[in-house]
């Protein structure tokens, strides 16, 4: 029932947006709406848990309201999500990092709901937020489907991180120091309730027992090569909460993210994450990849890329895991893409059983309204 309701609202908002675009609206509205859908057809050809094929999807509805007609610099944003279909990591591949970054099971949930106020070079955001929407963002790794190219596994798997699909309440302050330097810091609920006790992510609780997650990031928006773009980020995070026996647990780590344009069409990226070996299973993470835009001259908006992600797992008989991904995104038009994708998972490490290397094939498609 909930899925049917969601799809109905999804189509209604999509139709409303299309109708508004067709109509001749002269005055700029403070409201804007958008919707998107991503679908994955995933096949595990060999290795892993078992061979097989599954389908999974992610639908999003977004609404944005700016306050400029009343006061300057205010923005309210809402994002509702629905995930459905199979779980290839859990049921087919058995990997640690997650072959699909939209895998979450069958859920309908409030993903983001926040207010942002800008003051010159400063801005403050308060509400339900995704940490990875602002921190540890890998700009040139967005082509890839494996979850680690979005958020490091050393963050996602070591602490209760407010990331897709389960976000958390938080406050974020950003300072654009200059055109080349930016600093931001945030604090989040340290232990957001899971979907079993909070099925739609609308029942929020804040208490000292849940602790907090603090993160700060400094970004240098300068290129190492003349005439090219580049971005370099360094972040530190600290997590604290009280467990069931009333003892304080502390954890943390740091990360680096580098995006560098090499030529007009070639972009390189790398990620590094480190966290204390004494309290973390995945103490080291690193990645390296490239994204080439317009490989075929007649298709300038297409993207091709190859990337490698390594999750160093030190206290397991299974050992560390490495994912190698190759993707080609065909941009059909401004709103539609199709992306064939191949991943080779060396030593899938997401189960308690030693698994054979897995070869996984994708066809991902996306639609935006």
Residues of each region from the PLM?
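Short loop/turn motifs that connect adjacent beta-strands in outer-membrane beta-barrel proteins
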Residues: 21-33, 65-76, 121, 180, ...
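Transmembrane beta-strand segments of Gram-negative outer membrane beta-barrel proteins
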Residues: 25-45, 76-78, 147, 154-156, ...
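Hydrophobic, lipid-facing positions within transmembrane beta-strands of outer-membrane proteins
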Residues: 31, 57-61, 109-115, 167-173, ...
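Membrane-embedded beta-strand positions of outer-membrane beta-barrel proteins
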Residues: 33-35, 76-80, 124-126, 173, ...
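Outer-membrane beta-barrel pore domains and translocons
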Residues: 36-42, 81-83, 129-131, 188-190, ...
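Outer membrane beta-barrel
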Residues: 52, 56-192, 280-298, 303-315
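Detector for outer-membrane/organellar transmembrane beta-barrel domains
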Residues: 221-314
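Outer-membrane beta-barrel "beta-signal"
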Residues: 306, 356-369
